[in-house]
């Protein structure tokens, strides 16, 4: 197995990304943005079921995941993806900018949250290199 690493002030940065969002337009924009920042977008998925299948196929080391998905919400999907793809860095996103409590982030195994409208200006390498969130 080959690990793709990008240097950062953290020891590991996810570089092979799965995008999960029910909006095809957002997935396309996010894929373009991630590619411009040096990430490899492996696959895109529109819901939790597609995301789990994509994880089984491509084993991403990072996942950009919408909180508001049809069917299971993004928090439940994040927990399922973390169990299916141990070690993947999960970054939650949403058009809703409300703060996600650390306890919720820890429970669903996400490492960060970024509002969709802030994605273009976010330091994605730092977001995808964060260690798991502690509720302490």
Functional labels for PLM-detected ranges:
Residues 47, 73-76:
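Acidic catalytic/metal-coordinating carboxylates
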Residues 92-93:
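Hydrophobic/aromatic residues positioned on beta-strands within the core alpha/beta folds
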Residues 44-62:
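Acidic, metal-coordinating helix/loop segments flanking the phosphotransfer/catalytic sites
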Residues 75-86:
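Short amphipathic alpha-helix used as the core "switch/output" element in two-component signaling
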Residues 70, 98:
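The feature encodes the CheY-like receiver
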Residues 1-16, 119-136:
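Non-catalytic signal-transmission and effector/linker regions of two-component phosphorelay proteins
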Residues 24-43:
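Two-component/phosphorelay signaling modules centered on CheY-like receiver
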Residues 74, 105-112:
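As written
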């Amino acid at each position: 197995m080959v690990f793709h690493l990008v240097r950062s002030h953290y020891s590991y940065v996810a570089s092979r990304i799965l995008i999960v969002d029910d909006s095809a337009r957002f997935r396309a924009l996010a894929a373009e943005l991630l590619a411009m920042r040096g990430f490899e977008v492996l696959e895109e998925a529109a819901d939790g079921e597609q995301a789990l299948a994509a994880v089984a196929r491509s084993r991403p080391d990072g996942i950009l995941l919408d909180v508001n998905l049809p069917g299971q919400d993004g928090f439940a999907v994040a927990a399922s993806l973390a169990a299916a793809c141990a070690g993947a860095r999960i970054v939650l996103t949403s058009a809703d900018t409300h703060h996600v409590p650390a306890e919720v982030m820890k429970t669903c195994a996400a490492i960060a949250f970024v509002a969709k409208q802030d994605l273009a200006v976010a330091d994605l390498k730092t977001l995808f290199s964060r260690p798991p969130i502690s509720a302490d």
